Structures are given as structure tokens and as C-alpha cells.
């Protein structure tokens, strides 16, 4: 150490002792700008055999317990270098030369674990939840949240991590060493924004030294002085990474990158999951090129600007959302089969609708026309006489056989159509729509397929000149539209006129129970 540095340190020691109480505040404000003094103090700390080390440690402790914020931060900036000196001396087992440093570290620790009234501090950390807006993500949504009873009831549901109360320590041992050092590094990280560049450089350098000493990488880094391994804890390495991450974006890119690689190297050797997770996360978030931030500018960690729109989907998949999606799907299906629902009618006092589909209508028309022609021809031939009675009987038998086959074929086709419609109509498709006559009023849904009159005779008293083939197309829906509802003034559908040798028109009913 040079004589100039020794003179600056001695002047600093004597100045504070003669300083009046009223001048402490102005003295503390100007102290952080004395870069030459700060460099000289670093040189004193780095020489454990220096005679000035003990008075310097005592002076720094007086600064810390003075209660002045500027003096407290002045002492904190030397914490990384003090920790390295203590760990290096502990590794060499020369505990006598580290007594003053150990006393300073213990004094700062015992002052930090209690408040001004002497009670133990309990530090709390709220873990942000991604499902709720916080200052860490989507802070723009916080202002729009209404202060309701529901919001207040969920206020205390966030996960909170507590640190403390911490016991007081009278000496540092192998068991409590890193518990104390981790807490001190936590206090240092809390004041990172007030630390000068020389303190950030010291932090990165001592992190690299602690992690590689005694390992093959020490030869690559060309560190000398300490060749034995320095044990570290997982929590201590996480606190080191916190300071390194801040140094990345505040003018110390190269040193911070080297320190992070060394911490990651040591975490891989120790198989510590916490520092591995944090180091890999920092490494993945770093930009490709070096950050050229000004050392004199504002010190902050660059983060991505919070988006104006929420990144989290508010449409969470729940049982209610699944039910709603199912209802929407069934509602669309109901709209798509409106034509098929016309075929469905309500059972009302034994009434069955005479609706028929267009396909079955055409098939039945063909069969009825054929059968009517055969029957008319048969009656004409009977009145003709007995000249060709034998031939008429044979022709009659053939024609009756053909017409019977055609009628049976038409009936089988219509049965297949009705069966297909019954299978395709599901329970969800028969749900009632609001504002309409509900099918749920009855316990049975009847599908009625009435076939046209086989003889083809027109129906008497047709409404508005409707032909006999169209008279049976009225369904329950069409009757309700025409206000032909059964009630006190009940009107029956026109009854087909009966003729001799005419069978009752076949009617097929299929019942779908709601059970």
C-alpha cells in the first residue's frame, strides 16, 4: 500500500472523531464522492496484515450504527470485499488475522436483525400469482380493480414467505457462517441501486473467486493466493446471482458474465437446484450482444414493457365452460334440424298429426295411383259382363299381386325413413326453445306417419281448395300456426270418405320415452 493511500485513510479516521453532531449529515453526503478515499479503503481491507485494518473496521461499524442513511450505505459497499477476506482467511485457517473483520460482520448482522426498538425483524416476501395482476406483471390492471368485499376477502390468499426472526450471534462458526453471510448479502442486495461501480466490480470478482478456488477452472481464471476450496451454500449462491444480475445492466457486462459462468459452473458441481435454476434463467433472458449502458446513468434492471392487454386467458377451462360449450353446440344442432322437428308433434287427447315427408309422399302417391287404377279397372271389368270372366280373373289376380307388392315396398321404405329419423334425433336436439310450445309438456313424443288414401279419393271439405293428396300434410306446428288448437272449440281433421272394398289407411307410430 502506498503512502498516499495510508495518509488518506489516517486523515479520514481522525476527521470523523472530531466532527460535531450537527455536521454529520453534510459529511455523510459528501463522503460518497471521495473516490480516492474509497479506493484506499479497499486496499486496506485486501491486506489482512495491515495495521490500519482494525481501526478501519471499527470506523465502518460506527458509521453503520450511527443511524445516518448515507453512512450506513457507505459501510455496505465494502461488504463483498469483507466477506471475501473473511472466507479466504478461514480457508487458510489463520483465524487470528480475521478477528476484526469477523467482529464487523457480526456487528452489522446483529444490528440488521432487530428494529429500532430492539425487537426481532421478520421479513416477508409476497410471491406473485400469475392469475392475479401485480406490480411484477400486468400492473396496469391493478388500478381498474374495484375495491369490493370479494377483492378484500381474497387479499390475504397470496403466498407469503417469511424470513426470520434470526437469532443473535456472538461468533461465526462453520455451522452458522453462511447463515450470517447470506443475510448480510441480502441486506447488500436491498441497497444495490445506491452502490457505486467499484462495489459492483468487487462483487463480481469475489463471486468468481469463491466459486472457482480449488477447482480446475482456477487455472483458467489465473487466480492466485487461495488454492483450497471454499464451501458455499445454495442460498448464498442465489444471493450472489441477484447482485450479478443487477451488474449486467449497469455497466459491468464483462465481469458479470464471467461471474455468472463461474457460479453456474460451481452450481453444476455441487448439484444445487436453486442456483442452477436462477443462473439458467438469467442466461436465457440475456440479450445476444453486450449491453452498453452508461456507468453514470440511472441504475436499473431492464425489463420488458408491460403489455396493455392481458396475456393470461380469462376463459379458463372449467366444468361450467364445458357445459356452456355443450349447450351452444346442441343449440346450433337444433337450429340445423328445424325441418325434422316439424315432424314431431305433441300427444293431445289421442290426436296424431297426419304429416308425411316429401320423399315418402311421392312414393305413396305412386303406389296409391297404381292401386287406384287397378281398383277402378277391376270395377269396370266386373260390370262389363261374363264374356271374358276367366281372363279378367287371371289379369285381376296378377294386377292385385303387383299392386300388393308395390304397397308393401312403399311401406317398408317409409318404415326405414321413420327409423332413421328416430335414430338421428337425440335427446339434446329435442330440447325446448324459449317462446315455443315445449315438447317437454308430454312424457311421450310421437312420430306419426299417415299414409295417403290408397284409393286416391279426394277429401271432402278441403280448406281453400286443397287437394286430397295435400290434405294430410298438416302437422302440429302448421295447425298451431293456423290456430287450429284443440280446446273447447275443437275441430277435427276431415275424415276420409270410405268406399267399398277400401282398407283403413295404415298409420305407423313410434314412441320415444323421455326416461
From Swiss-Prot:
Residues 358-378 have a biased composition (Low complexity). Residues 358-410, 491-515 are annotated as: Disordered. Coiled coil: none annotated. Its main location: cytoplasm. One of its GO terms (biological process) is myelination. It holds the Pfam family Hyccin. InterPro entries: Hyccin. GO terms for cellular component: cytosol; plasma membrane. Residues 498-515 have a biased composition (Polar residues). It comes from the Eukaryota. It is found in: Cytoplasm, Cytosol; Cell membrane. Keywords: Cell membrane, Cytoplasm, Membrane. Residues 389-403 have a biased composition (Basic and acidic residues). Component of a phosphatidylinositol 4-kinase (PI4K) complex. Belongs to the Hyccin family. Component of a complex required to localize phosphatidylinositol 4-kinase (PI4K) to the plasma membrane. The complex acts as a regulator of phosphatidylinositol 4-phosphate (PtdIns(4)P) synthesis. This is Hyccin. It comes from Gallus gallus (Chicken).
Amino acid at each position: 500500500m502506498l503512502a498516499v493511500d495510508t495518509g488518506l485513510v489516517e486523515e479520514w479516521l481522525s476527521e470523523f472523531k472530531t466532527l460535531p453532531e450537527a455536521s454529520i449529515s453534510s459529511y455523510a453526503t459528501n463522503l460518497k464522492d471521495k473516490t480516492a478515499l474509497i479506493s484506499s479503503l479497499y486496499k486496506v481491507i485486501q491486506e489482512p496484515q495491515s495495521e490500519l485494518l482494525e481501526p478501519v473496521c471499527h470506523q465502518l461499524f460506527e458509521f453503520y450504527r450511527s443511524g445516518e442513511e448515507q453512512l450506513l450505505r457507505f459501510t455496505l459497499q465494502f461488504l463483498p470485499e469483507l466477506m471475501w477476506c473473511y472466507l479466504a482467511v478461514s480457508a487458510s485457517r489463520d483465524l487470528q488475522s480475521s478477528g476484526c473483520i469477523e467482529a464487523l460482520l457480526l456487528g452489522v448482522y446483529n444490528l440488521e436483525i432487530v428494529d429500532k426498538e430492539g425487537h426481532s425483524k421478520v421479513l416477508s416476501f409476497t410471491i406473485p400469482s400469475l392469475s392475479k395482476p401485480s406490480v411484477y406483471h400486468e400492473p396496469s390492471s391493478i388500478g381498474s380493480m374495484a375495491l369490493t368485499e370479494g377483492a378484500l376477502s381474497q387479499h390475504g390468499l397470496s403466498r407469503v414467505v417469511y424470513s426470520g426472526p434470526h437469532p443473535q450471534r456472538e461468533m461465526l462458526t462453520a455451522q452458522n457462517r453462511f447463515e450470517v453471510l447470506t443475510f448480510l448479502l441480502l441486506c447488500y442486495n436491498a441497497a444495490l441501486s445506491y452502490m457505486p461501480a467499484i462495489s459492483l466490480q468487487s462483487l463480481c470478482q469475489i463471486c468468481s473467486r469463491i466459486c472457482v478456488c480449488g477447482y480446475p477452472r482456477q487455472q483458467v481464471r489465473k487466480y492466485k493466493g487461495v488454492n483450497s476450496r471454499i464451501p458455499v451454500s445454495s442460498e448464498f449462491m442465489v444471493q450472489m446471482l441477484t447482485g450479478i444480475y443487477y451488474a449486467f445492466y449497469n455497466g459491468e457486462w464483462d465481469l458479470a458474465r464471467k461471474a455468472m459462468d463461474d457460479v453456474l459452473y460451481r452450481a453444476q458441481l455441487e448439484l444445487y437446484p436453486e442456483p442452477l435454476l436462477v443462473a439458467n434463467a438469467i442466461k436465457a433472458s440475456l440479450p445476444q450482444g453486450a449491453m452498453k449502458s452508461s456507468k453514470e446513468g440511472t441504475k436499473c434492471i431492464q425489463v420488458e414493457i408491460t403489455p396493455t392487454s392481458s396475456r393470461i386467458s380469462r376463459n379458463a377451462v372449467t366444468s361450467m365452460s364445458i357445459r356452456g360449450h355443450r349447450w351452444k353446440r346442441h343449440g346450433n344442432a337444433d337450429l340445423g334440424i328445424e325441418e325434422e322437428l316439424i315432424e314431431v308433434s305433441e300427444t293431445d287427447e289421442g290426436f296424431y298429426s297426419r304429416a308425411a315427408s316429401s320423399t315418402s309422399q311421392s312414393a305413396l302417391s305412386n303406389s296409391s295411383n297404381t292401386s287406384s287404377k287397378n281398383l277402378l279397372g277391376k270395377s269396370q271389368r266386373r260390370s262389363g259382363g261374363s264374356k271374358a270372366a276367366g281372363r279378367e280373373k287371371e289379369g285381376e289376380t296378377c294386377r292385385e299381386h303387383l299392386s300388393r307388392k308395390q304397397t308393401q315396398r312403399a311401406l317398408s321404405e317409409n318404415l326405414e325413413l321413420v327409423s332413421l329419423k328416430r335414430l338421428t334425433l337425440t335427446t339434446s336436439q329435442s330440447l325446448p326453445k324459449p317462446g315455443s310450445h315445449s315438447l317437454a309438456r308430454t312424457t311421450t313424443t310421437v312420430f306419426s306417419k299417415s299414409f295417403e288414401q290408397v284409393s286416391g279419393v279426394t277429401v271432402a271439405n278441403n280448406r281453400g281448395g286443397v287437394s286430397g293428396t295435400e290434405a294430410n300434410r298438416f302437422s302440429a306446428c302448421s295447425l298451431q300456426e293456423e290456430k287450429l288448437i284443440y280446446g273447447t272449440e275443437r275441430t277435427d281433421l276431415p275424415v276420409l270418405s270410405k268406399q267399398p272394398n277400401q282398407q283403413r289407411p295404415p298409420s305407423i307410430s313410434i314412441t320415444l320415452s323421455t326416461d
